[in-house]
Amino acid sequence: MAPGCKSELRNVTNSHSNQPSNEGDAIKVFVRIRPAEEGARSADGEQSFCLSVLSQTTLRLHSNPDPKTFVFDYVAGMDTTQESVFSTVAKSIVESCMSGYNGTIFAYGQTGSGKTFTMMGPSDSDNFSHNLRGIIPRSFEYLFSLIDREKEKAGAGKSFLCKCSFIEVYNEQIYDLLDSASVGLYLREHIKKGVFVVGAVEQAVTSAAETYQVLSRGWRNRRVASTSMNRESSRSHAVFTITIESMEKSSETVNIRTSLLNLVDLAGSERQKDTHAEGMRLKEAGNINRSLSCLGQVITALVDVGNGKQRHICYRDSKLTFLLRDSLGGNAKTAIIANVHPGSRCFGETLSTLNFAQRAKLIKNKAVVNEDTQGNVSQLQAEVKRLKEQLSQFTSGQITPESLLARDKEKTNYIEYFLEAMLFFKKSEQEKKSLIEKITQLEDLTLKKEKFIQSNKMIVKFREDQIMRLERLHKEGRGSFLPEEQDRLLSELRDEVQTLREHVEHHPRLAKYAMENHSLREENRRLKLLAPVKRAHEIDAQSIARLEKAFAEVSSTETNDKGLQGFSPKALKESSFFTNTEKLKAQLLQIQTELNNSKQEYEEFKELTRKKQLELESELQSLQKANLNLENLLEATKVCKRQEVSQLNKLHAETLKIITTPTKAYQLCSRLVPKSSPEVGSFGFLCTESSSRLDNDILNEPVPPEMSEQALEAVSEELRTVQEQLSVLQVKLDEEERKNLKLQQNVDKLEHHSTQMQELFSSERSDWTKQQQEHVTQLSDLEKQLQDAQTKNEFLKCEVHDLRIVLNSADKELSLVKLEYSTFKENHEKELSQLSERHVQVQLQLDNARLENEKLLESQACLQDSYDNLQEVMKFEIDQLSKNLQNCKQENETLKSDLHNLVELFEAEKERNNKLSLQFEEDKENSSKEILKVLETVRQEKQKEMAKCEKQMAKIQKLEESLLATENVISSLEKSRESDKELVTNLMNQIQELRISIGEKSETIATLKQELQDINCKYNASLADKEESKELIRRQEVDILELKETLRLRILSEDIERDMLCEDLAHATEQLNMLTEASKKHSGLLQSAQEELTRKEALIQELQHKLNQEKEEVEQKKNEFSLKMRQLEHVMGSATEYPQSPKTPPHFQAHLAKLLETQEQEIEDGRASKTSLQHLVTKLNEDREVKNAEILRMKDQLCEMENLRLESQQLREKNWLLQRQLDDVKRQQESGDQSHPDSQQLKNEHEEIIKERLAKNKLIEEMLKMKTNLEEVQSALHSKEKACHRMSEEIERTRTLESRAFQEKEQLRSKLEEMYEERERTFLEMEMLKKQLEFLAEENGKLVGHQNLHQKIQYVVRLKKENIRLTEETEKLRAENLFLKEKKKEF
């Protein structure tokens, strides 16, 4: 910047509002054009500019042959004020920092383009209070005003901590400006903090004034120096960082937000030929240009990465780019101010700055809120649970406002239909993808099979060719082989051919694939024929049709309901859709698993039912047979019983007869004799003789009665034993019959099963017979083939000998081939190892070549950019020089014409002199004295003319010298152009050499790629044998993974179902609790709500009255302001009507000062009204807290009433029990069964019951009263809730009014700042006008003193020209003033 330009940079008002763009987190680029200095005017009074502003977002660069147009986010002209720049650029960044985002603002441009003035302001005054202060002081003011506003709104629940650090990057070293004793600091990187400076001082600040003190203290330590382009040129990059930490407490949780605001003043790029830097300044300029070129390379790489290219971003090549890494391509919102110089001599730097800004505009960052939540773990868990429940309630549609319930109910069906349609669409897409994958796999499988079959066919063909060759050899040399050898050879070869054919035709994988394919087709056909699958398809088709119909209806009705807006915000809708989709996905997985399980269960059930049906049929037939057998047995048993009864009757009659006959008695007697005399046993012979003699005597004797009784007893005992034995045998017989029945049933089952098996066997026998017949036919065919083979064998036996010889030779060749193959395999393995090593080396070389190629491309791009800039600069300078040359030629022509006129005057004077001399000679004699006088006057005039001629000749010599100087300048410019051409040719040669080297390297890369492809082909060929086994393993792994996946899905579906059930249970319990709490709340807010309503209504009326008063005052102030502006316009108009007056109106300055004082007083009044409104809002908040406490107290009272209600219920139950006991006692008294003490006890109990009944009646009355009170409280609570809702709406409205008033206040403040800047500008212009008037007064005095008429005329003409110029300037200023007033009226 030229000397003194930083302090003399003037701006005028530009009424652009701060309209944030909706381009996400893209880097915002703003261009500011600095005004040209006063010394940059040409000879004709006009300035030579290379820029022109077309609109607020576009500017034009006057390049040759065609001008270039650039588009940016905002273009600030030469008359833009500091306040408009701040409101456009920095306000949104500061507000985002208050919201928790990182923000960065930095100025870029050449040296002397106004970067420091834009960021800081004038350098020779107090920047913090100056009207022309820059972005950094204004950012401090706005930041702390926002902090104070947040503190007033939140009270003690929110606190802020601001810390400042100030560093500079000087000669690629980092220094701390707040610590003058610091040496080179280091940069470090942290995962959360990002890039930071180790050891930098951070100072806490609490106000904008403290922050500015820290800034000014560090600014004094910054390195600045003077150059030919700027009086105070920044020699380092300065970064001022403000760390903003906000801590918000809510119950037991603490929400912490941290953000960084980086304010960067970059050093300007410069050229040595412009700044004439030497020594240390030249080294500093080299480091500055190097860091700025690294910044340009980083931005180019970021643009390429944003366009999808793979590029390395060289952040670490410079300390500046590494420090600004997050600001350029990370977590920050960034604004770049590109400062440019409009002068034509800065065309090259202006063009490079605009190209840099245009590239930076394409970068997009990803800014996020830096937020951390701390607090009690249980409290956080409860908060998370509450939010989840609220989210579930929102998604389920339970929490909806009363005004939108109907619309939400109408939309639920549409949402469900839409989600189902999306699920069907996703399902169809997934099925389509799976089918496409299966098709591709099957195609790959068929290709592999075809390749395998072709290879095997080729092997068979080679073998057959070998056999044909051996046959031909055998025919040529018939009889050389023995018949046994020929047979053996032929049989071996035939066997080999047959095995190969079988290998081709009956490959196990082919058979496996065919079987799998067939089974899959059968399974698919069977599943399609199942009734559930058909039903599912039909249901899907019906649901799709229903969804399409519903979607059409909703889409038709949605156009009619566009005016209505949903209550739930977009985030809630998205969350509800997300949760619904998750639940529907889980349900879909569950239904799919259930479908698979039902299919499996259906198959198992089908098999079981078939088996059970067979068993039941067999059991039925066996039971039928058993039933018939049992009926037969029953009839047989009846017949047997009849026979047994008849036999028993007969036996009984016979026993009676036997008992009554004497033979029986005799037998009894004979049985009793040996019992009575046991000694007779030794004398058996004598007894027999005696018994034979006594037979007749015993028979004739009568039977004694004792013996008959004994005989009866013995018979009865024997009958009893027989009956017992009979009963035991009967039981055994029954058991045997049951066993026989069971066996018979089993036999029947087995017979039925055997019949079924026989039927199966018969069907199988028929099949077997058919197969046997087929085998017989095949056997006959095989016999025929055997006969043919025998004939062929006989034919081929003659060739066996030759084939054996050939086989021996083939074996020898095979052994040689095996040896060659082993050696080839070893060599191949060695080559593979070498090729793998070479592959690695080639890959490394390729990577190195790629990196070198990228570097060369980057350098080529940089050279191309510099070449283009040089071309543009050269064209622009050539154009300027050609214009200067034309001007010089025109001046030379004018000087030549003036010289010719002077020569003609000189000749005329000579002729006059000659005439006078002749006249003198003629009149010499007549009037010598007069002639002498005349001669003397002529001589004087001649001397004057000669002096004039000498002056003209001196002017001519000066003009010739200037012409020679211009010619020398032109020659030097031509030489510089030739040197530039030589530089351009050198650059072109370098580019050509680089292109040649790139071509050579690309050729080497191509050869390396070809070698790499050959190596890959060999490597792939060597690995082809391993792919089949890997494929089998992969398939097995895929099967295992599929089984695991199905198991995991089943487990997941069960877990999801369990979680859903748990959530439903928790939701139901929560709803129950909420209902109970709501009933409690509704019962306790009557009196407080009424008082609150009356108070709030009065307060609202008071606030509305004050608001109306404020609006009237604002309108009155606006009217006064417009009136004063009209007065100012009138004063300015009166000032411009008299441009030649040497004095200004005396009352103008005082009137303007009074006007500004009144405006300041009005602003102070507005601030006071704002503070009073804020106090009212705080009072309202305090009242609200008091009412919340009263609500809590009423809740406690409601809890007590609920406890009383429970106690009354318990007493009612006790009363009922006692009433029953009393009734029992009365019944007992009436019966009279109880004794006297019991009756006394009953009397006591009766008295107690009476007392309890009275107490119960009292409690019932109190309960009824409480119920009535509760109903009244509930009704009052309902009305109070409505009032509270109205109050909350009123509070929201007051908040919006407060925010609107804050915005209006900020707009008024910015307008006031612009007015201050305009006042400064008008004061400066008035001073200039005063100086001009004083100068005119002096010149007027001089004009009065002049006596020569020619001089007076020239002076008056010059004054008229000056007067015309001044009137034109005043007209321009008046037009600008009118334009600004119209803009203000629009606001």
From Swiss-Prot:
GO terms for cellular component: cytoplasm; microtubule; spindle pole. Residues 10-22 have a biased composition (Polar residues). It holds the Pfam family Kinesin. CDD domains: KISc_KLP2_like. It comes from the Eukaryota. PROSITE patterns: KINESIN_MOTOR_2. Expressed in brain (neurons in the external germinal layer of the cerebellum and in ventricular zones) (at protein level). Expressed in spleen and testis. GO terms for molecular function: ATP binding; microtubule binding; plus-end-directed microtubule motor activity. One of its GO terms (biological process) is mitotic spindle assembly. InterPro entries: HMMR_C (IPR031794), KIF15/KIN-12 (IPR044986), Kinesin_motor_dom (IPR001752), Kinesin_motor_dom_sf (IPR036961), P-loop_NTPase (IPR027417). Residues 1-23 are annotated as: Disordered. Plus-end directed kinesin-like motor enzyme involved in mitotic spindle assembly. This is Kinesin-like protein KIF15.
